From Swiss-Prot:
Superkingdom of origin: Bacteria
Family in the record: Belongs to the UPF0301 (AlgH) family.
SUPFAM superfamilies in the cross-refs: VC0467-like
A Pfam family that the UniProt record links to this protein: DUF179
GO cellular component: cytosol
Signal peptide (from-to): none
Name used for this protein in its record: UPF0301 protein Nham_3550
Biological source species: Nitrobacter hamburgensis (strain DSM 10229 / NCIMB 13809 / X14)
Annotated transmembrane regions: none
NCBIfam families given in the database record: PRK00228.1-1, PRK00228.1-4
Region entry Disordered, spans: 1-25
Length: 216
């Protein structure tokens, strides 16, 4: 994880249409992307992604259902010198329950924390939608380790990124479904069931899903 203490490298999208002043509804900030069976990239097969930023300049999101294998949150805190290594590391309950995800294939050495809006760092936390925020500095990990962090949080290593127009094209090609997110699904501990739950959220039976289905 990067040790930088600065604002995350994502920008809040501009929502006003240049001609009418009306909100542009085409962007997907705060939405879930659900991979379709046609998805050929194994890194994203059966993935559920929370879209943190989406604009004409591209998109950025965090995969919610890819555990980072043997990576342990306490070990990461030790590596970052946030806590000292000992035989009996004692963390607050919220930190003990913290899951580490593979957030995506971009900047895999950097950590991104999706969290509830009860925690905010000026000039570092990016509010997204529906009480969900993103922070990518060490300060939030230090707060979590001390029991002073957000009530709900996920630590992701890396993120998923799209070039301008790329995500829109993938959706048109039936690579992704999309639907509104909710904190219960984002922060729920049932990692293995998130894909099925996300599909049920939009009324789709996973067993009936085909490569030809369109986007929601």
């Amino acid at each position: 994880m990067s040790a930088a203490r600065k604002r995350p490298g994502t920008g809040r999208r501009q929502t006003d249409d240049a001609d009418t002043g009306a909100p542009d509804q085409s962007y997907l900030d705060g939405q879930l992307l659900i991979a379709m069976p046609v998805m050929e990239d194994e890194r994203f097969a059966r993935s559920v992604i929370y879209v943190c930023a989406h604009s004409s300049e591209g998109a950025m999101g965090i995969i919610l259902n890819r555990p980072a294998g043997s990576v342990d949150f306490a070990d990461l805190l030790v590596q970052l010198d946030i806590i000292k290594r000992s035989d009996s590391i004692k963390l607050p309950e919220t930190a003990e329950a913290m899951k580490v995800m593979k957030g995506g294939p971009v900047e895999t050495g950097r950590g991104f924390v999706l969290h509830s809006s009860d925690f905010f760092i000026e000039d570092a936390t990016l509010p997204i939608d529906d009480g969900v925020c993103l922070t990518a500095t060490l300060d939030i990990l230090e707060a979590i380790a001390k029991g002073a962090g957000p009530k709900h949080a996920i630590l992701a290593l890396g993120y998923a990124g799209w070039a301008p127009g790329q995500l829109e094209t993938e959706i048109q090609d039936n690579g992704w479904l999309h639907c509104p997110a909710d904190p219960e699904l984002i922060f729920g501990r049932d990692i293995e069931d998130k894909y099925t739950r996300a599909l049920h959220k939009i009324g789709i039976d996973p067993g009936m899903l085909s490569n030809e289905a369109g986007h929601a």
